Amino acid sequence: MKKTEGWVTAPQGFLAAGVKAGIKASGNHDVAVIFSTVPAACGAVFTQNKMCAAPVLVSREVNKHGYAQAIAVNSGCANACTGEQGLADAKKMQAHTAELLGIAPEAVFVCSTGVIGQFLPMDKLLTGIADAVDSLDECEGESCAMAIQTTDTFIKHAAYETEIGGKKVTFAGIAKGAGMIHPNMATMLTFITTDVAVAPDVLKRAVKKAADKSFNMVVVDGDTSTNDSMIVLANGLAENEIILSEEHPDYQAFFEALVACATDLAKMIAHDGEGATKFLEVNVTGAATWEDAKTAAMAIAKSPLVKTAFFGEDPNWGRIVCAAGYSGAAMEADKVNLSIGGIRLVENGMNCNVPAEKLAPTMAEHDISMSIDLGAGEESATVWTCDFSYEYVKINGEYHT
């Protein structure tokens, strides 16, 4: 497996486009379409927020069919908390895309992101979808990625190539997300395309596992959104022997490439946390169970006191062990070890009295890793997050959600 350059059009048989439909006040790209020239196995996971948006309800039904061919997306309006009209608008968005592409409506996923509680500007949206369909091309992957952004500061995309059954297989993905990031799936839109041949039921299970290893290990601010969706389309044009079960000899290579692509995108979202100045990796080891390791890591990653300490470049390790302690994870206080940037600060639950000046260069870095051993077992987990800055408050004070 190797990392490569490419957009969602890198795998065989995929076209995409993003256009400016006038939904965003900024005038930026705001409508996108991704299209597979042949039916593709699909797998998706969606927000766990009980106030899920209309497009999530529609797309959940698409996912049940096992096969799909297109994804239609708009940014600038979430179509959430919009009642029956919102649901009707999402279905119209789906039907319009399907008609233009000459496929069945149930083969089209729909996604929206942006301001909650407002109706979609349907005239602009439908015109935008038509323009995007007219613009579909292998060379329009970047414009597609631009069109799904809201408060993002950079385009998020990743691509990998691997060999499966003697065939070259490509995985490529795009994502958006910068705020309201918290499992399970939160203010993230993620679309991954691949030309691997895999059975729909196998793909569905793999997507869920991949999300648990990547996007569900990212925290920016602890808020869970209404619209999050991770959708994977696999059209089989690589012509490898179809992967029919997890026991297939090629399953592991397929799954590793899917996770690699998803993990890259997840880390980019943490890097792009609203107002972030630091990318933080929280490693928990020595846990009694994986669930405990994740629980402790999440508590640390979500803690405003931990996040603001890193923004201030203050090695306040007490906040880290405190968060682990109240997380509910099993731990042995007199066996806890903690390091930041490889420098041991706590040994067997006691202060190592490291001079602040020794830690200053580490705390000044953009990417910082911390590791805490709970002393309770052998399990581990890693969560990615960012700091909290003045800019985060400014952005969310000014951005109308």
What are these regions (language model features)?
Residues 1-74, 78-88, 95-401:
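A structural signal for small-residue-enriched, beta-sheet-centric alpha/beta enzyme cores
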